[in-house]
Amino acid sequence: MNFDIEKLDSQMASDEKKLFFIQTYGCQMNEEDSEKLSGMLKRMGYENTENRDEASIIIFNTCCVRENAENKVFGNLGALKKQKEKNPDLVIGICGCMMQQKGMADDILKRFPYVNIIFGTHNSYKFPEYLNRVKTEGVQIKEIIDKETEIVEGIPIDRKSDIKGFVTIMYGCNNFCTYCIVPYVRGRERSRKPEDIVNEIKDMVTRGYKEVTLLGQNVNSYGKGLEENITFADLLRKVNEIEGLERIRFMTSHPKDLTLDVVYAIRDCDKVCEQIHLPVQSGSDRILKEMNRHYTKEQYITLAKKIRAEIPDVTFSTDIIVGFPGETEEDFSETLELAKEVRYDAAFTFIYSRRNHTPADKMENQIPDEIKHERFNRLVEIVNTGIAKGNKDAEGKIYEVLVEGYSKNDEAKLTGRTRNGRLVNFEGGEDLIGKLVNVKIIKANSFSLIGEVEK
């Protein structure tokens, strides 16, 4: 289904104060959803502001993977009460995964009755319509669609960067890991047509983009449900042929579905970067089974070794959960051993967070918080040691770096990433931004590298 751009153009902003503010919680999928909300609003004549207090429209795009993200939303909603009283015309919208949970939207309206619009993950393209109704009819809107809908193509998008951007290739997840709420709030797997993906990337290239990150809850499932017989490896090869594109990244890969064909595509496609996000979650076979992950510790390690054999410069990042119900000290030790053996270059480590309506929430032997935190600290120490070693090994080597802009920590330096994802800061002129340059690494820090441009 194609987005109705003509209808959007008929809903131009009438506010004197045409400013909007979007707060995004959660993953890269949410970030891209927010970029589309921003794209629609800008098409309507609104402008973005980073100052929430001056906005006439405020949107919270929510996440429900962990309880902490939900608590932040509640806190920020409460803080808007005075702003709404001061400016009754302020439009407050809440969307995203958190809203898809049973009873959540009604709870929000009960606790924060000044919220104007609530919608979920399947109907964000209708936000301009909701906004128009609030402004013209003065109604309060709550529309949560429980079942996944047809993919909508052609939604205007306002990407944060002019150099690199996210491109969603599929939506939803069919895996139902016992700790995870994503399949319940994002729906079943649906793949975009390859021609739609390729055309979007070609359009980005004409606008000057050098790098794309292909997004999906499990990119290795790409192709399911399409009439055309196509796999994720096939898609990588198609995207690799796009003239003018310099780099291709992707996430996330489920270890059980990452085939050798994908590994060979990464190896053979010159634009696909040597970086793989491969969530392991645990190193214990018993816990992996309880999580419904469908692989063992040995299978995961074997896969990592096969990948390294084919792609020597590859770096791995991962997700690890600490304190899953029933996790013993022995189980946790298996996770530490795996982290040491694989040696990750980045890791997103999480303390297990109970999620309503997931099987793990009902499991016995929930781990006390003090044990979770103690194990978490031990894991972070192991992971950080591995990251520091990887960075130290980079000293003296020359890497191709895509210059993304000025460093957030040192505005006198430029920043960018190597093909395998390492963050490099170095001195250079503004004219280098957006270009690929060779940088020699002269110093390794804990989580970044210092380099100098090769003349």
UniProtKB/Swiss-Prot annotation:
Keywords: 4Fe-4S, Cytoplasm, Iron, Iron-sulfur, Metal-binding, S-adenosyl-L-methionine, Transferase, tRNA processing. The lineage of its organism: Bacteria, Bacillati, Bacillota, Clostridia, Eubacteriales. Belongs to the methylthiotransferase family. MiaB subfamily. One of its GO terms (molecular function) is 4 iron, 4 sulfur cluster binding. [4Fe-4S] cluster 2 binds at residues 173, 177, 180. It is found in: Cytoplasm. Monomer. Residues 159-389 form the Radical SAM core domain. SUPFAM superfamilies: Radical SAM enzymes. This is tRNA-2-methylthio-N(6)-dimethylallyladenosine synthase. Its cofactor is [4Fe-4S] cluster. Catalyzes the methylthiolation of N6-(dimethylallyl)adenosine (i(6)A), leading to the formation of 2-methylthio-N6-(dimethylallyl)adenosine (ms(2)i(6)A) at position 37 in tRNAs that read codons beginning with uridine. Residues 18-136 form the MTTase N-terminal domain. GO terms for cellular component: cytosol. [4Fe-4S] cluster 1 binds at residues 27, 63, 97. Pfam families: Radical_SAM, TRAM, UPF0004. Its EC number is 2.8.4.3. It comes from Clostridium beijerinckii (strain ATCC 51743 / NCIMB 8052). Binds 2 [4Fe-4S] clusters. One cluster is coordinated with 3 cysteines and an exchangeable S-adenosyl-L-methionine. SMART domains: Elp3. Residues 392-455 form the TRAM domain. It catalyses: N(6)-dimethylallyladenosine(37) in tRNA + (sulfur carrier)-SH + AH2 + 2 S-adenosyl-L-methionine = 2-methylsulfanyl-N(6)-dimethylallyladenosine(37) in tRNA + (sulfur carrier)-H + 5'-deoxyadenosine + L-methionine + A + S-adenosyl-L-homocysteine + 2 H(+).
